[in-house]
Amino acid sequence: MFNIKELMEVTEARKLNDFKIDDNKTFVISTDTRVINKNNVYLPLVGEKFDGHSFIENAIKNSDVEVYFTNNEKYNFKNALGLLVKDTKEAYLKLAKYYKDKINPITIAVTGSCGKTTTKEMLYSVLSQKYKTHKTKLNHNNEIGFAQTIFSLKPDVQILIVEMGMRGLNEIDLIVKYANPNYSIITNVLTAHIGRLGSRENIAKAKCEVTHYMKEPKTAIVNNDPIILENITDKNINVITFDINSPNLKIISQEESKSVFEYKNNLYKLNIEGVYNIQNALSAIELGLILKLSPKEIANGLEEFKPFGMRWNVEKYNDNKLTIVNDCYNANPDSMKAAIKTFFEIYKNKKNVLVLGDMGELGENEIVYHRELGEFLNNFEFDTLITIGHLAKNINIASKNKNKIHFNDLNECKNYIFDKIKEGNVLIKASRSMEFEKLTEGVAK
């Protein structure tokens, strides 16, 4: 992947000793000494709670690695070459950019408050119909995940899809500095991370960083929301909008695990319900058309997309009498309301139960947001409300539902669900920190 000349020039490294390396030998970057060998360069990353430098001395003693990066001159590299850099993470990102530029795939950056992972997966399913496509694994959406994604690229990749997350300003800016996307997608700007950023305006600024450092054709495909459009500061960017209220969109039907809609006179099907999932699909359609896919290829890609990873997974129990919609990957006030609305649109006139937990990172107004959600529930008739967590108790208090229960313990709630609810439909949703996946773990389907 890299010869010694490239390693030094790209990272602006300085040799700490005179250990000789064959100029023609190539090395692969590794950040983990547990799986390292002679063909690897060890690059120790430094984080808030870890420092890869603490493993260097053990690696020197117990491995045959020939090249080490470091930000510290103290190490004695007797039988290996030490390369000194100011910042090992910066060196990691520079090497990733260099390798990406050699392959030169069309690069697509995806961000948003909600739906970015789903959109990335839809894009991958669509664009793979025509191109050799690579994507960020799961939700490895920070700068380290970006570099790991790049180093897993194969030379024949034509399109790269990079998901970009953030918990504050300038975090996406750091990733796009090295990613240089040709296309950027913003799914939406909602209340996720409002506790950290303080306002929706700041969230929009952070998300719109995905339009920085773009390469031609410098095209942003974004939700038609004024707060997004106002925060795209580069006026040379070609902006294309998508809108769930577009006159070009006609939602034909939604039922369990199926949505059918028409967009720009073409019919599309998804194996998942929810207006917000149709909205996610619109950005994939728009980019597919730009990249010369036919409507049929796009339709095939969308139909092949499958829900994944605690994102609206429909699970059946008790001989199909009990349906649990597992949407517990994460939650904020907007995604909660959208999921609840979809749940009641799909599952009508049956015994419906909501199991809701704490929503995190909402800042000083966290109690208000939870009470507002409880009041929102008063728009619907349903059987039982179950809440878990000290914040979710405020949902319970604000709800006027006659049947409501609050638990402080996941196992108690799990036992109640499977002991008391034998049929009907259950939606489970909470922030990732609540670990709601444990509510269905180990239960026979």
Model-derived regions: residue spans:
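Active-site beta-alpha connecting loops in nucleotide-dependent enzymes
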Residues: G47-F50, F308, C328-K400
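Short glycine-rich anion-binding loops that position phosphate/pyrophosphate groups of nucleotides
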Residues: G47-K49, K74, M166-L169, L190-A192, ...
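Mobile, glycine- and charge-enriched loop segments
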Residues: K38-L43, T133-H134, I144, Q148-L160, ...
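Acidic, Mg2+-coordinating active-site environments of NTP-dependent enzymes
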Residues: E6, V10-T11, E73-K78, I185-T323, ...
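Phosphate-binding loop of NTP-binding sites
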Residues: K5-T11, E90-N224, I228-N236, G288-L291, ...
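ATP-dependent carboxylate/acyl-activation modules
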Residues: V110, M310-R311, S433, E437-L439
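Residue-level signal for inorganic ion chemistry
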Residues: L7, N40, A59, L95, ...
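N-terminal leader/targeting and accessory segments in enzymes
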Residues: M1-K94, I346-Y347, E375-K393, N401, ...
